[in-house]
Amino acid sequence: MTSINIRKLSHSEMDLYRKPLLPETWSCFPVDKEIDTQSLKKVLQKDLDRIRSGAEKDPFSNSITMLALDISRRLEKKKLNYSALEALIQRLAVGSFGLRADRLKKYIGEIDRKKNDKKLKQLIINLSSEGNKQIPFSEFKKKIEKNIFGIVLTAHPTFGMPSKMLEDLANMATMTKVDGKKITLKELKVIIKNIFKTEQRPDKNITLNYEHLLSLKALKNLQLALNSFYKQIIITVSEIYPNDYLKITPTIFSLHTWVGYDVDGRGDISWADTFNKRLKVKLEQLEIYLETIKGIEKTVQEDKLILSKVLIIKKELKESLEYNLEIYHTLDEEGFIDNIKLIQKISKFMFENKEKLLTNTKKLFHQINEILILVNQSKLKLKKKVLMDFQLLKIGMNNFSLGLARTQVRLNANQLNNAISKEIDLHGDPDDPSNKSTYLNSVSKLIDKVSPVKINFGTILTENMNAKRFFMIIAQMFKYIDQNQPVRFLIAECDFAMTALTALYFAKLFNLDKKIDISPLFETEKALATGHLVVETLVKNQHYRKYLLQRGKICIQTGFSDAGRYLGQPAAVLSIENLQRKIAKVLADNKLSSIKLLIFDTHGESIGRGGHPVSLEERLQYINCSYTRKKLDEWNIKLIQEVSFQGGDGYQYFLNPDLSYAALTRIAEFCLRPNQKFNDDILYNSPDFGVEFVNTIKQFNTNIMDNPNYAALLNVFGSNILHSSGSRAIKRQNDSGVKTLVYHPSQTRAIPQNSILQQLGMLANSLGGIGKFLRKDPKKFEEYYNKSERFKRILDSVKYAFAFSDIEVLKAYIDSFDPGMWLSWSTRTADIERSNNMKSVANLLESFDIHWRLNKVYRELHQEYMEIRDWVLGRKSKGRIAVGRGRVIEKEIRDELLLMHGIRVAIFHELFLLSVQIPKFSDQAGVSRDEVIAKLIRFDVPEAVKILRTIFPVGKEKINYSDYGEKSDYISEKDINYTIEENTIFKQLEALHECAKRVSTGITHFIGSVG
């Protein structure tokens, strides 16, 4: 069963399905029941092959543009209709989803639970011995109880498919259901059939609640996987240390979440949202503890004393759930945030019932230990099982406390700087050399004399500074949700030591410094270059040094997404590992090897944001390289590694229990593999090569980021060709008319920017600069690729990016804006009306004057692409060598991807032709016809159509002119019913735009990630 090719099976099932693929409930166009998508796909594929073969003789032709024009001609001659195109898009998107399931299965490795049990057991056995000798139990206990790896779930906007499909993806990859039962071939076909009846787009109106609930599902599966892992540890240890196995409380892994607690760049998350999301995480954990106790209750029925004590715990957990639910439902009420009386009421309720809320696990631990003494003395039939169940419960409480995961909050450095500015008279840059020391000394003096203050929920309501309010929320979470579990305090874009020191000041002010771990995030170009200096300044500050020694660790976060956007991903990954080593060296040089270095590498599933495409094992090696681990060992710096799994794309590994367990096994293999030796790597032995590699790629990407023509490329297409894939809105800074065709790329976040590049067929963040570096010395480049394990791992991502990129695709999209192409096309079109519309499009695009700008970027990227092509496919290859050869994906799959691009270019052409058919109108409400068309040309169709419907209404109530005492036969323009325009232009624009966005979903499936 596991060898089934799901992509091919999906296509064969769609061939056998004789009904239309598209239900009328959500189809964009009237369903054509006679469509044969299999035949249509073959016809267009033959067209593409024919165009390619003829194009070898014509260096100026473009196979994707030619395919799009061929589709347009078929539409013009009625040999093809929009309904057929929509159905074909559905087919290709479903096939690409099958490919995604196949890829996930391969990416995760061994999925069979019993085989993974054996792998984990062997890892535990290996930990218990050194040099073929069993180590003392005390040493083993220290090893097994260390926290060495953290899994962090985030709410990044990568929810690119319906949640049901996301769960189907996990189930198909494992061929198991959530209950662990195997999926039969018949059941798999039913899943596929349901998928091709599903609209290929994310769920509509994604909210923070939606993201949070999905993250809870993932966390529950992760806990199940961890409990299975811990059970395997106890079973194995019982065989190695039979007298001591119940004395261990293994940790190794920790679970974290920032879903609902990340307010960096978000003004839509209130303090009540954050508090309530944390409370929900507690409620779910209490439910797990209660269910465990209920299970134990059934096994101790014969011993009334033990049963009575178990029932006491059960009663306390149920009572805690009831009281916490009362708070949760109150805070969840609509309008709560503005209802002062309700806030006062629930605040008093919390204060008066604090003991019943259960805010720490000390009492539970004490009760369980008392019961364990009785169990050991008892003659219970299921004594061994009861001991195991209680031990697992204790391990769970030790690791999870009162929440499915540990809390990580995040805000932006600017929010902290603003909050402290008045107190230290901060003006301008905190790192300004003329004031830097003054600012640092001022914050230190504040810490010298700070005294903790008391706050309540009323204090939160009256505080205007976001940063201070956030500290207050954390204080209340400790007070009323969980007193014990530490909170990570992440500071985004933390380029200055003063900012982290400010966080410490506020932590002390609100009496949190013993419970939170401040973690600066280094992701900008400046931070990656100077982050170690920030840390050096902090560790030399007496207050921060004392704080670190007290916490026993220093926490930092390194961000691959923005680093990849600004520097290029190949340069970013090397810059990040270099920074991590520099920070470790700072700790060693400042005699701080007694504290642990916690590095949270935040990255996404896409290669542009730090995800490695080959396997989960390769991904872990990619972000946490062996050379860095070697240097940390030399400096005696203990490492705790954390990685992020961002949004829906990240949760995919944890929406099926067997998949979660497999993922956890791969991570355990990475962390616990014995005798991990570093083999000498030519990349580190010859640092000049690596430095020049980074600098070349960095130079290319920083230049292109500041290039207004690159900005134009991103802005013309923009996020309007994408469905919204998260609760965080993606809007341009300026959104009016023709003049907004150019802006700066930094105004777009990493995910949408990467998404746009994916959709344009050019993964520039991973490719840019590689060609330039290749040109310098191809032989040396090849030598390092063959001899350096690290360099090859980085370049494998480049090869993957190349496989899903095509310079002709980019050119086809760009040439949609070429007035010359439209004029040439108009002269070869028999339909006079359509020809005239093409001339109108040409005139329109001439006035926009954008094509030449896009072409300049194309030429720059073309040079990069061709150098990489020559390296991947061989310099002897000429012309348009067949797609697929020498690439990491086969030709058939790549051709399906190119078909999707060709179809969408044709859709864009149809959109442009419809745009110029809008009736002329005088400016209304400050909006001109040119501005509306400008919105359409940059694919902001919903907003444009909304404006048009206001100007050209349908079915407007008619005024009876006979009631005014005198006759009138005048017909006002307002009395005209624009039903024809509605049906032939406005609805068509919306439908075509939706189809274009569904293509985006399909392309996302092909590549395997959003952005």
Predicted segments, located by residue:
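Structured, charged N-terminal subsegments at the starts of enzyme catalytic cores
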Residues: 143-147, 154, 253-270, 323-510
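Catalytic core of soluble alpha/beta enzymes
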Residues: 521-573, 577
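Active-site-adjacent "gating/activation" loops or surface patches in catalytic cores
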Residues: 262, 468, 483-484, 497-503, ...
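Extended, highly charged
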Residues: 2-250, 272-362, 407-410
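Short secondary-structure boundary/capping segments
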Residues: 274-276, 412-414, 421-424, 503-508, ...
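Hydrophobic faces of well-ordered beta-strands that scaffold small-molecule active sites
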Residues: 407, 487-491, 514-522, 554-558, ...
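Secondary-structure transition/capping motifs at alpha-helix termini
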Residues: 240-247, 479-485, 507-516, 538-551, ...
